[in-house]
Amino acid sequence: MRNEMNLQFSALSQNESFARVHRAAFIAQLDPTMEELTEIKTVVSEAVTNAIIHGYEGNAEGIVYISVILEEAMVKLTIRDEGIGIFNLDEARQPLFTTKPELERSGMGFTIMENFMDEVEVISNESFGTTIHLTKYLSNSNALCN
């Protein structure tokens, strides 16, 4: 059975933890393992933080959009912003690359997403924002997360 949820919120850093927990609660109905759930929460955190810090450059008037689609043992996440976009996507996806070293950013966001998810697609246009599509296939091991 397919189930879908959408969420939008102001681009405030304090909303990142809400987004992470909110998505995890929705995904729990598929009964992921604790490891899978932790990986998804981490990926949501990374993508939302990127949207807030890099996409909107801390402008709280921006809106972050998240959708989740659940189908059988598959989770599809989309995190989108309408910020400044990524100027060099290949460079941004390199481990340890950051445009905000003064904020003590590690530059590992995309690397984490690529390691924790089965599919990662990033679409970005300068001045029009960034959309990240993430897919995770769950082990369906009846982990009793519910």
From Swiss-Prot:
User: What's the domain of life for this entry?
Assistant: Bacteria
Q: What is its EC number?
A: 2.7.11.1
> Per the UniProt entry, what are the Gene Ontology biological process annotations, in alphabetical order?
asexual sporulation; negative regulation of DNA-templated transcription; negative regulation of sporulation resulting in formation of a cellular spore; sporulation resulting in formation of a cellular spore
Keywords, sorted A to Z? ATP-binding, Kinase, Nucleotide-binding, Serine/threonine-protein kinase, Sporulation, Transferase
Coiled-coil spans in chain: none
Q: Name one GO molecular function term.
A: ATP binding
Reactions catalysed: L-seryl-[protein] + ATP = O-phospho-L-seryl-[protein] + ADP + H(+); L-threonyl-[protein] + ATP = O-phospho-L-threonyl-[protein] + ADP + H(+)
Reply yes or no: does the keyword Ribosomal protein apply.
Answer: no
User: What HAMAP family does the annotation carry?
Assistant: Anti_sigma_F
State what this protein does: Binds to sigma F and blocks its ability to form an RNA polymerase holoenzyme (E-sigma F). Phosphorylates SpoIIAA on a serine residue. This phosphorylation may enable SpoIIAA to act as an anti-anti-sigma factor that counteracts SpoIIAB and thus releases sigma F from inhibition.
The UniProt family comment states: Belongs to the anti-sigma-factor family.
The name under which this protein is listed is: Anti-sigma F factor
**Which species does the entry assign this protein to?**
Bacillus cereus (strain ATCC 14579 / DSM 31 / CCUG 7414 / JCM 2152 / NBRC 15305 / NCIMB 9373 / NCTC 2599 / NRRL B-3711)
